[in-house]
Amino acid sequence: MKKSERITIDVITTSDMHSHFLNGDHGSNIYRAGTYVKTKRKENEHVILLDSGGSLAGSLAAFYYAVVAPYKRHPMIKLMNAMQYDASGISPNEFKFGLSFFSRAVSLSRFPWLSANIEYKRTREPYFSTPYTIKEVEGVKIAIVGLTSDGLMNREHFEMENELQIDKTLVASKRWIRFIHETEMPDFLIVIYHGGINQLNKSANEREQNVNEAEKIMQSLGVIDLLITGHQHQTFIGRDDQTLYVQAGQNAEQLVHVKINFKQRTTSYELEDVESQIVDLNEYKEDEDLLNLTFYDRKT
């Protein structure tokens, strides 16, 4: 098959949805997000859908499905599977109801949950199978690696099970990003970091700065093309040297859409430019297929 002269890859990201799947609940627009994603997939088959984490706790609905009815399949997992998410980051919220709850959610997901610094204590290998995933699009290799804020995990006082630990975010990021560049040689590297950026809080003390280490990750590594952040429930797009950094708010009220454009060389593709925009979902209708999928969940 003849290679295209140009390839555009659409990266769409959400953040901190906190199980707000009741339509009209706290401005949640996950059903409108579903419509937007469907629309973009009709326009371009090369869509990568990501979430920065924080989707399984933080609402009464989340409590119900974790504590009152843990035997039921979690509606957020059903929705994210149906929307064909490609990967999610991991936040401390995922551990709020215990490791067994989150492990079951992971097992029911048709996408990987990524964190390079949540590890087995004995081996220091990633606890959730793989810290990164590779998406190949017509010969263009996109690497996606996950990181969880160790400062946020410690601040929230979540008890880690005996068999796992949280490594320093910067230590793990250096280890795994170097490994990915040396072994996978990606054309574009995306980091999903469930933590924030300190420039949003000029009065941040040292403890808060250790929670939000996005700047340190960008400045100490310098080989990241797109950094997806979370936790702060803010919506923004910025740039630090070669790294585009974004955050997609909360509850799918908005999302961030990044267009990655490659042009063909003799035997490979070269990154041409990256476009980005914040998308307000209020103008989109709710996806009827997704509403039908959670009809009985929303009636519980």
Question: How should these model regions be labeled?
Answer:
Residues 88, 298-300:
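Acidic, glycine-rich low-complexity/disordered segments
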Residues 290-298:
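Phosphate-proximal small/polar/acidic motifs at interfaces that engage nucleotide phosphates
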Residues 1-289:
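Acidic, metal/ion-coordinating pockets
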